[in-house]
Every structure is written in C-alpha cells, then in structure tokens.
Amino acid sequence: MDKVISFIQPSRNNLKYLKWSYNSIRKNLGYRHEICWADDFSNDGTWEWMMETAKKDRNIRVMRNEGPERLGHTILYDKLVDIATNDIIMIYHADMYACPNMDVEVLKHLQRGKVVSATRIEPPLHPDGPEKILKDFGIEPEEFDEQRLLKFVREFTKAKNGRDITNGIFAPWAMYKDDFLAIGGHDPLYAPQSKEDSDIFNRFVLAGYDLIQTWRGFVYHMTCRGSRFKDGALRNPAGQVFMKGRESDEWLKQNLRSTRNFIRKWGHMVQHDRYMKPVIPPKYDVGFVVKNCNTNMLKELEPWCSDIYGDWLGHKGYGLNKYIEEEQKDTQFDISKKIHSDRVKPKNDVVLQFDANKLTSQNFQLLVNLSDMLQDSGEVGEMEYDIFKFYIKSLDTYEKELIVCER
C-alpha cells in the first residue's frame, strides 16, 4: 500500500482523548501516516504535550492558535489541510480510536472524485442509526475495553453482514487534498463550529463527488468531547450512559447561529437520508412581502428568504435597526441589504405575500418546506395557498453557485 494519509486533528482542552486517539493511530496503523495537530488555545497542557510528542514522532506537524479567542475546527481543519504534506487528508476527531486496518479499508476505495468514510462504533449516548454501530466499549479512556472492541471488529468483518459499502458521509472521512481545495474547503460562515460539515457535504454532492462508507474499516468514537458536552459522560447505577449536565451554553448559542446561517445560505434545514447522504432541495431566489411584521417576527422570517419587504416606519424602524445591529454580529451575510421597505417593488424570482398576524406554527411550515414545495408543484404565475399569495416569475435555481467557497 503506497498511499498515505495526513490525519487532520484539531483539539481544544480534550487532552486525554487526544492522547488516547494518537496512541491508537500509532499502535494500529503504524508511523507511516502523517498526523497534523492544531491546538485551539487550550489551557490543559495540550500544546506542551503536542510539542513534546512531535520531538519523538517525526511524522507529526503542529500549529497553535495563540488566542485569546478560539478559532474552532471550522477554521483549523483548513489551516491543517494547508500544512499537510500528503496527497490524501482525513478529517479526524480527537475522540476517535483507529481500529486495525481502518486505513487500508478506506484507501481501498479512495480515488479522485470520491470521499470515503470509515464506520463509527459508538457507545449509546445518541440515538441509533443504520449508518453506525451502537455498542458500548467504554465512555471514557479510563474504562475503554480495547480487547473486547478488537474482538468485535474481527468477528464483524469475518461475518457476512450484507454490505461492504453504503453511500453517505460522516467523520472520519478521507479525500484527495486537491479535491478538497477545489471547492474551497470549509465555509468560515460557520466558525467556530456547527453545520460546517453539513455544508461541505452538500457541496461535495453538488460537485459530483461520490460519497462512500466502508463497513470493513472502523473507529470507536466517544462522541462530542469538545465544546458540546465538555464535561464528559457518566453511568447511572444501572450502567446506562449519559452526558454530564447538558449541552454547554457555548455550544447551544453557536449551534443556533450556525443553523440560522445554514438556512440563509441554502434556504432549508439540513437534510440527509438514513445513511447520512445529503438531500439537497433547490435554492430559489425568494422574497417575502410581509404585512404587520414586528421585530420578533422579522427574526423568525429573515433567514428563510433572500429579501424581506415590510412597513418599518416609526417604532418599527428603531426595532429594525436594532435587529440589524445585533444580527450582523453573527453572520457574514449583509443583513441590511436583505431588508427593504414595502414601497420597494420586489425583485425576486419568487415572491410570497402574507400577513404576519395570521402566521401559525402550522402554516409557518410552508416557509420551512418552501424549496421542496416549489420543486414539486411550483409553476410560473400567480397562486394562493392558505394565507400566502405567490407571484412566481421564474423557477431558476442557484444551489450550484454555492459549491465553491472562496477562501
């Protein structure tokens, strides 16, 4: 096997998982693959350990964010790809254990124009799904049952399980570096993290890359040991596992920001099939002309359209300016250019007219699913449905304009 990988592995204050992950790569895959680490302004000794390890292991490259703010893996993945010296990169979480032959099985399928994922084995901290194996071999490195895991992997790969590959994607995933760079890598819109993976997966599909998951190469994934569940996991007296506390405030706030930005960019929520292959509705140019739109309703509606038109006179104008000022801090989209007076004639391909006072949780779902609805039954012309009046002059779509991210 002459192909070699550059493992792309940022880390932030999760040193014990990073050590565990590093040891598995070197023990089970050897020293032939490069490991690229980035310390994201940690205060738990991560940088010192990285530097010391790099002195002993010459196939490691390290870099550091000096702070004072975190950059997040959205940015650091791409910075590490830039310094990687191999033709093949693998996006790899710091809480993943590489099982023997994982690299061989991934590389067996890898060609240019393909993105290949290993299969995750995870403890039951999240709902089960057909794209992974839910089996408990430990929730912390201290209790990790390595020998039982390795026995399970040997038996699983020997058995006829009905599939060698499926079509989908989740970390760890590998591809040629030049394919990654051709679409501009991750979009910094989502920095420091959350939804950057769903965004780039959409762009892989739109660029024509094949998404392959091998069911003969495995990692054991502790899951979410960064900012989301920063305090780790526990067992209750019955042995069931759960995360300590709840998702961190930092993660919850950033996930909301990234979700709103994903909707602004794509016009819909994240969608995928049961094997995690992206489902990508068309992107339309949509304008909302909204009667009785106050600031609270503006916050709900603005991400779902290209432009929004309303009556912003008087106190509404003050609220509008406040909304733009606050929301602009959380996005690279120019919010001020999206919001217009209702005296301005809408310029969008698809225009929806409605009264915000008549919106309910039920009919709001039409806006959430608008891309699917227009794809299935949209026609040029005028129509009415529920509280909405449609004025459709074109059903051109723009999702392919989102493939390349200019860095």
Where are the regions that the model predicts?
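A recurrent flexible, glycine/aromatic-enriched loop bordering the glycosyltransferase active site
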Residues: I75, V153-D178
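Short, acidic, metal-binding catalytic loop of nucleotide-sugar glycosyltransferases
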Residues: N23-R32, E300-D307
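Conserved donor NDP-sugar-binding/catalytic core segment of glycosyltransferases
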Residues: M96-E142
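Short aromatic/hydrophobic "clamp" motif used to bind/position activated sugar donors
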Residues: I89
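Glycine-rich, basic loop-to-helix element that forms the pyrophosphate-binding segment
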Residues: E66-A84
